[in-house]
Amino acid sequence: MIRLDHLPKHEDIQIYQDDEMFCINTDTMVLGEFLEVYKQDVVLDIGTNTGALMLYASLFNPRRLVGIDINKKALELAKKNMELNNVQNYELIYADGNTFRLDEEVDVVIFNPPYFKTPSKDLGNNEYLALAKHEDNFSLESMVNCINRNLRNNGTVYFLFQTSRLNEVIKLFNSKKLIIKKMKFVYDVNKDFSNVVLIKAVKGAKEGLVVEKPIIIDRK
């Protein structure tokens, strides 16, 4: 069922969501609030789904805003969401991140990727959620290759991933000279460990990492 919601922390920005697909959650919100984008930037959102992170990026009025996804139904909703909020200079492209290359290198890549290695039985036969949450068809290595292929030198990637797999991320990012410059761990108020971590990396940058104060999520 399609419903009309608003972007977390931005009640003036509305977004259509489909209960059968991946909907906005705290991961979306914390990554959206983590972004820094400039007006001259070309921004690429890999796996845009219904365009929530594109809407966050649009608040900075970038020169060009591109979202790609392999889910045509999600792209249709993303188009409605861009039009609903009068977003300018946007493009939505049906494409597979395993091979996608934009017609120019970009300044910023945004990515809230599928980060589970194996599908959950709870998803049943929901192909939309399987694509959004599990990396069967888009491995972590392929994700990093897609970022590297499209990001200019000194360009920035904003990324969110499972904390338990941080070593994998660091190894793969370093192999492509995507140097992690900032991290912020996200905690549930009721847990003693972090489930996800926000990452800012810069292609070809010098070493130097800042770990910011964590985000504590209270779901009440």
Task: Cite the ranges covered by each PLM segment.
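Short, well-ordered coil/turn elements that cap or connect secondary structure elements
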Residues: 10, 38, 60-62, 87, ...
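Conserved Class I SAM-dependent methyltransferase catalytic core
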Residues: 14-16, 20, 24, 137-194, ...
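SAM-dependent transferase fold signal centered on methyltransferase-like domains
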Residues: 30, 76, 80-87, 127, ...
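Conserved SAM/SAH cofactor-binding pocket of Class I
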Residues: 30-103, 108-122
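SAM-dependent Rossmann-like transferase core, predominantly class I methyltransferases
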Residues: 2-42, 48-60, 197-200, 204, ...
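Residues at secondary-structure transition points
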Residues: 22, 26, 48, 65, ...
